[in-house]
Amino acid sequence: MLNTLIVGASGYAGAELVSYVNRHPHMTITALTVSAQSNDAGKLISDLHPQLKGIVDLPLQPMSDVRDFSADVDVVFLATAHEVSHDLAPQFLQAGCVVFDLSGAFRVNDRAFYEKYYGFTHQYPELLEQAVYGLAEWNVDKLNTANLIAVPGCYPTAAQLSLKPLIDGGLLDLTQWPVINATSGVSGAGRKAAISNSFCEVSLQPYGVFTHRHQPEIAVHLGAEVIFTPHLGNFPRGILETITCRLKAGVTHAQVADVLQKAYGDKPLVRLYDKGVPALKNVVGLPFCDIGFAVQGEHLIVVATEDNLLKGAAAQAVQCANIRFGFAETQSLI
């Protein structure tokens, strides 16, 4: 059994991790922690997230010193803010743990990226070099031996799963940048209260136009520029992305379908649509990314859906852990 610590367990993604790890036959939860200053310290996880009542009734322990929790721990999931993960990950690695970080702290190997988009100076360039980007379907070989896994962002997961096989397959005319219009539920903004996320305020609105940190994350890992516009929708969870691309002259519907099938035909957590395009309701609460597309002449529209808290966060983290330790990829997920 892998002794597993979940840091930042009080949040939405943290609670999903608790659920997955609790039912994993090869993992056991050693502790659930929050920051020492958290108002949730000392509360039961099941009081904050009642869906866990009678299933996981562990307390949220305040953590001020990593050494109090790292002994005999094999796996650490960090469901923490970017700056917090930046500080904690090196300490857990030093203690011999394998770290799965759900924040953006180690996703891009460029210190200037963090100053520009995250507002802090990255102190661990050697870990940026070592970190493996956890886009699970595409990085299996590297994940097998990784000790620091940077779980991709929610928007970048759906965008890259949609575009990577098309770009790598040489089907797109990249002189016209792919345009990604993405809408996420309010849970993507986290559990902390904010006026902009309150019931009476939330509507349907773009945000972070030309400035969102997920745009460079997508572009860096695709090796191609994109235009990315996120939107906040008036629903709790899930992401739908509509991606408009130009195909190279002569590329057919059948070629697009073939490239996607070759990429994901044996990938259990990506579901391809033979006809039509996916709806959000079919992935909420599930660990899948659903992908469908339509072609008209040289124009291609790809639609991808996922649960932002699952395939966009907790489920992909556990999927990466399954790959890292040689378990079935879908263990505890489906």
Swiss-Prot record:
Residues of the active site: C154
GO CC field: cytoplasm
Primary enzyme class: oxidoreductase
Pathway: Amino-acid biosynthesis; L-arginine biosynthesis; N(2)-acetyl-L-ornithine from L-glutamate: step 3/4
Function: Catalyzes the NADPH-dependent reduction of N-acetyl-5-glutamyl phosphate to yield N-acetyl-L-glutamate 5-semialdehyde.
NCBIfam families named among the record's database cross-references: argC
Similarity comment text for this entry: Belongs to the NAGSA dehydrogenase family. Type 1 subfamily.
Protein name per the record: N-acetyl-gamma-glutamyl-phosphate reductase
Annotated source species: Salmonella typhimurium (strain LT2 / SGSC1412 / ATCC 700720)
Encoding gene (name): argC
